[in-house]
């Protein structure tokens, strides 16, 4: 008798679950929003005027336990200013084949230049495509921002940038002012 009831009990479980609502998420077609603090792709942030926040200190690379970050710092000049400080990150790479998404690089950054976005779709069929260079990591320009290199806002110091008191309109005015100065020398 137990030989007969065993398979029926198994089919009973199958039949009872056949008519329940499934928990399947139809991922590529229906994307579920991520949590606000999700650790996704990294992003190099900018100040309100478009200058980069990265100062090329390499603390993020030193903090990375997977050795996934490579940074080369370079000195800013008055002609080519990429960040308000003395230095900027000339070369910045993150190897997502090695990155474990721990966020230690974010905690190590003294200027909050590096943050993580909610973007998680980074799959690629090419290994070289998973090494993100600076151009793919930089935050996009927002209205009022000017592409670096450009001079600091008139009268602003590095401390003003650090405290967040520099606005995007000040940089646009500085850029317009420098363009006027450049064309003034061409007149007879």
From Swiss-Prot:
Topology relative to the membrane: Peripheral membrane protein
Keyword set includes Magnesium: no
InterPro entries, alphabetized: 4Fe4S_Fe-S-bd, 4Fe4S_Fe_S_CS, NADH_quinone_OxRdtase_chainI
Sequence positions that bind [4Fe-4S] cluster 2: 64, 99, 102, 105
Top EC category: translocase
Occurrences of domain 4Fe-4S ferredoxin-type (ranges): 44-74, 90-119
Pfam families found in the cross-reference section: Fer4_7
Catalytic reaction annotation: a quinone + NADH + 5 H(+)(in) = a quinol + NAD(+) + 4 H(+)(out)
Chain segments carrying region Disordered: 167-188
Record GO cellular component, one term: plasma membrane
GO molecular function: 4 iron, 4 sulfur cluster binding; iron ion binding; NADH:ubiquinone reductase (non-electrogenic) activity; quinone binding
Cofactor: [4Fe-4S] cluster
Keywords: 4Fe-4S, Cell membrane, Iron, Iron-sulfur, Membrane, Metal-binding, NAD, Quinone, Repeat, Translocase, Ubiquinone
Keyword Lipid metabolism among UniProt keywords: no
Family: Belongs to the complex I 23 kDa subunit family.
Reported function: NDH-1 shuttles electrons from NADH, via FMN and iron-sulfur (Fe-S) centers, to quinones in the respiratory chain. The immediate electron acceptor for the enzyme in this species is believed to be ubiquinone. Couples the redox reaction to proton translocation (for every two electrons transferred, four hydrogen ions are translocated across the cytoplasmic membrane), and thus conserves the redox energy in a proton gradient.
Record's protein name: NADH-quinone oxidoreductase subunit I
Natural source organism: Rhodococcus jostii (strain RHA1)
Gene transcribed to yield this protein: nuoI
